[in-house]
Amino acid sequence: GYSFSKNFFSDMGAYAARNGDQNYFSMILFAMSLTIVGITFISYYLLLPGLLGNNRTNYILTWVGTLFAIGGSVCMIGTGFTPSDVVFAPHVFFANNIFHCFLVTALFYTIVIFRSDVLRKRYAIGYAMFFISILTYVIILQYGPSVNSGESALIFQVLSQKIIVIVFCFSVIHQTFGFTKSGILK
């Protein structure tokens, strides 16, 4: 079965479960869910330049952030369609680059929200915290212990991934409240 502390999210999208059983249903749900989330993020970030690009500099910065968000979203979709037990290298490429791309997105949108008068500054602080969280996770990906070096290293990497995904979800919720309170979303 699936272990919260020893299985990455991607293990739900594997072709076969760790015990050798076929994992078709979970694999299909995993791919579909990441596709839906990826398409939703692409749509969301394509709208933001029109909402936050209230001057030339912000408009340019939002588009840079949006381009990286699209890249991260495409990587999210790619992660769903590359089961780790079938095509490991492409899967790792897509999975890691979700966070590399959204790191750049978070940096640019932190700057934009600080510069903009559309959202209150606390939402920029929230985005800055999101940036720091992703940066921490990217550092863990690059320099943290290898999952193959022992059980404690595996647990550390798996729980780090769980934490950043939870932070990602809360960041989206926080931004949604910001746009709702500002009257942009009704």
Which residues does each PLM region occupy?
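C-terminal ends of transmembrane alpha-helices
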Residues: 14-17, 73-88, 134-151
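Extracytosolic (periplasmic/ER-lumenal) interhelical loops and adjacent juxtamembrane/interface segments
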Residues: 1-22
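Transmembrane alpha-helical segments of multi-pass membrane proteins
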Residues: 60-74, 125-134
